[in-house]
Amino acid sequence: MQVPSIRVVFLLTAVFCVGVKSDECKTADVVVNVDASDDVSDQDFDKLKRAMLMMVRGLSIDDNQIRLGMVTYGSEVCDSIPLQGDRLDLARTIRYMKKPTGPSKPFKGMGEARRMFSSRGRYNVPHITMNLGGDIVDTEVKDLMDETDKARDEDIKVMAIGLGAKVDRDEIESIAYDRDQAYFMDDEDDLIRKVKEIPDYLCKIIKAKKPKVSGGKKSKPAKKVDNGPAGKSPGFDALKQSDDKSDKAKKVEVKELCDDAEWVDGVGYGSVPTRCEDFVMCQNVSGSLRKTLKSCPFGQYWSKRQTSCVLTEDEDCSDDLCKTMLLPSREYDVSCRAYWKCEKGKSVARCCPSGMAYEPGKGCVLDLDCDEECPPKNDGDDDDDSSDEDDDDEIEYNPNCPLRPIKGHPEKFKQHTGDDNWEDFDCAPGTLFSARDCACSILGTAKKDDKNDDGGDAHKVCEPELYLPFCDDLHDYSGKETHVENEGDAVIIENGKAYFNGRAGLKIPRFSGVPYGKSVFIKMKYKEDEDDDKNKNDDDKKLRMKRDERSRKDYLKAILKRDDRKDKTDDTKGRRIIDRNDIIDDRRGRRKDDRKDGGRDDGKDGRRDDRKDNRLDDIKDKNDEPMTLISNGECDNFELNDCFEKPSIAITTGKKSAGFSVTSSEKDEVDLEIDEDKKGYLWDKEDGPDRNGKDKDRNGDRSDDRRGYYWKKKDKDDNGKDKDKKGDKSDDKKGYYWKKDKDDKNGKDKDKRRDKSDDKKSLDDIVREIERSKGNGKDDNKDDEDDDKKGWKTVSLKISNGHIRGRRDDREDKDVLDGDLKTTFSGFQIGQGASNKNFKGYMDEVYIYFCDPGKEADYDDEDDDDDDDDSDENDKNDDKKDGKKTDDKDKKDRKDGRDDRKDGRDDRKDRRDDRKDDRKGGKDDRKDDRKGGKDDRKDGRDVRDDRDRGDKYDKKDDKDNDRLSDKDDRKDVDDNDKDDDNEKLYKRAMKKCDYVNKNVAKWLDKR
């Protein structure tokens, strides 16, 4: 059972104000061993993880201060976190650590901690192991003591914390570096309460000088071996020192390696702990044991089973750091260009291109001083090479690969297209070509020197790294074929738009660990979904709310129409009294009668309504929380509201605001905010203020808020007196009178005030309204487009050479950033991240540039203008050709017209003769009709009597049929309207996607 996350947040807030006070105690490498065997319940294991999270928050975790690692063990080591200084990464990994199984084997946890210090520990930095567990089984005490003694010899200080009332105090004290470094706690809850004291415990053991007696023997820390620059691991390099330096710890270590060696023909071969790529050779020379450390060839591991070096993919080394390492790559110390890349949990050797070096956390970067060979050549492997210029190509050339590298351009490769033809291709941004893999599998970005530029880049077009118009599912239209993940197809793509339901998002893993450069531009078009989740699935509640609102409005209208009631207002109770008996409660819209009330407590109802209003305000505030549009960090948006990897880019949106958060590589954080209520108002300043400092409208009249009336100064007659305006409401305020403005076509009062424009309208909307007012008639297609544009917003973030600009529609905010944008390893995430609510709504387009596009438009209108110009010229040429044909046709038409007019005169003469004959025959017909009419009227009376009798019986059936037919008609109308809406959406989507396809094709052709 997991502990509620909210309690964790409160505990963290209370604890993390302590910290480490002394500067001497702020630098150390700490590994925590946690006993999570079958003796520990799932609930207690969750409490241990809570304590670890609290400790991560309380310590000064940083790459230059305290680095923390963690090991959980049962019968075997389960999960381990390498030493690192990333607080967010540690918190994320701790929360998702799994509980191991089996009986407790604490010596295995201690051994894993020793290997971690040997491979990743810093030089001249205190190494601390915190052993956290319960009672130790007697059979495991000896093995644990042996590992503890080895840790002391390697100058690792052990802090022991015993949990539970059954722990043996003597055993815990014997494990500790000295008795003062042993602590006892009742249970996991007691550990949580005392976790704030752990920084003091660490400071105490860091300052400890001399170890005391442990296990009946004195154990002195081994002397450190100077192995070169700071930051290198002393574990393996200490074994490489010459035999002249007879260090006791070195001899013990090498002796242990030879004890476990496999002997073949008088030579022993043994593996080296934590170094899968190394082995030791043991030989008996003149009665003494000679030890020689060897390294496997590039990209190979030592296989104890085969007693030889094999490819890393063929050997399952238990000490392979890729089994527990979170980063995708790490340093390989055989060359400045070499590094290990994690693939499917195994390490694979890779080389950076020439002129580049591997830098941990960044990948391959430009380094002209790195001129080492990669793979390095072993002794005796020197063959006759053709020339120095071809060395790099020969090293990275794979004869079984149809692709070849291009010298000086690691971001490109050649592909054989038939015969003797080779064509150049570009790798995906952020990757470099590897001949060994026959693919663009190297993480990094190639950078060219200014000296080698041939001037071609001056006219290079800034191309998007990602362009998602959502026309063909999640197809990237930038030409880079970027893969976009849609887990579970939770994001719905339809009609050229993507719908996010508030619990889904898109992920772009390609941008993980890729340097962004000095310029980044992101642009998105979106529309928020205004439906409330709680009311969306509660149709009955919606119907009740609508019904009550309609009843309240109708009742108030009926009351206002009654002139026999006198309105009174009681300001103290917030009620409007209609007469002596009736009371209207404005909040509920219901009429109350004092005589039937029976002593109703209006104050109590008012308080109840206030509480209801507060709840509604809380729901409204919750709905106004910012939602994430895009980020490049991995965050938890539902539990602790914390980021495991803090994003360096985050764009959020609210109903009236937009936020932009940017973090540089220099740890400079900049936050921009665009708030419609505070920034970016559009004021109409054409009419200045009047003498009283108030804004005048267009006509110079003083506006007022009284139901469409406005103040207008009275006109003067010839004698200087005010004219009487019929129908105007006079007023005795200095020659001004009230005048009601004429209603518009919709029955609404026109607004005469122009002091400032509506802050919800953008400048583009105002311009479009003015243009529509100048046009004649209405354009249905244009109205459809305007309806489709309602609610859509455009947000963009531009970072260029240290300058930041965030914009939403026509409002923007600017600032300055120190350094380049920080690289993250979470990729880009659309619709989620940054510890905010997931986005709920629609997205129309998404652009990501790693350059400065200059203009914010994705594809300029220049292409369309060119097409229009070409079409105009073609139309002119066609008109000239058609002109000659038109003249000949006109002559023929005039001749035919004369013949037609002659025939028309003959036709009119024939029609006059026909009318004469018709009048003569009409007289005879009327006589016959009068005679037959008498008989028909008699028969008609009989028919009416029968029909009346039948209508009495059929009236009920007709009403039922009418109701059914009306219901069917309404259903058909609704279905037709729905089909029309879907057809409109489909047409708009096709129009948009046709435009996108046409312009993208032109852009790719130009590129």
Curated annotation (Swiss-Prot):
The keyword Disulfide bond applies. Residues 588-625, 676-781, 877-973 have a biased composition (Basic and acidic residues). One of its GO terms (cellular component) is extracellular region. Component of conchiolin, the organic matrix of nacre. Expressed at extremely high levels in the dorsal region of the mantle, which region may be responsible for the nacreous layer formation, but only in trace amounts at the mantle edge, which region may be responsible for the prismatic layer formation. Residues 255-372 form the Chitin-binding type-2 domain. The keyword Secreted applies. Residues 1-22 form the signal peptide. It holds the Pfam family VWA. It is found in: Secreted, Extracellular space, Extracellular matrix. Residues 651-664 have a biased composition (Polar residues). SMART domains: ChtBD2, VWA. Residues 212-244, 377-401, 588-634, 651-792, 854-983 are annotated as: Disordered. Residues 212-222 have a biased composition (Basic residues). Keywords: Disulfide bond, Extracellular matrix, Repeat, Secreted, Signal. Residues 544-547 are annotated as: Kex2-like proteinase cleavage site. It comes from the Eukaryota. Disulfide bonds join C296-C309, C352-C364. Gene3D superfamilies: von Willebrand factor, type A domain. Residues 29-202 form the VWFA domain. GO terms for molecular function: chitin binding. Residues 380-396, 858-876 have a biased composition (Acidic residues). Heterooligomer; disulfide-linked. Pif97, Pif80, N16 and other proteins form a complex. Pif80 and Pif97 are rich in Asp. This amino-acid appears to be common to biomineral-forming organisms. Essential component of the organic matrix for normal growth of the nacreous layer. The complex contributes to the initiation of aragonite crystallization as well as subsequent stacking of aragonite tablets in the nacreous layer. Pif80 binds to both aragonite and calcite crystals, with a higher specificity to aragonite crystals. This is Protein PIF. It comes from Pinctada fucata (Akoya pearl oyster).
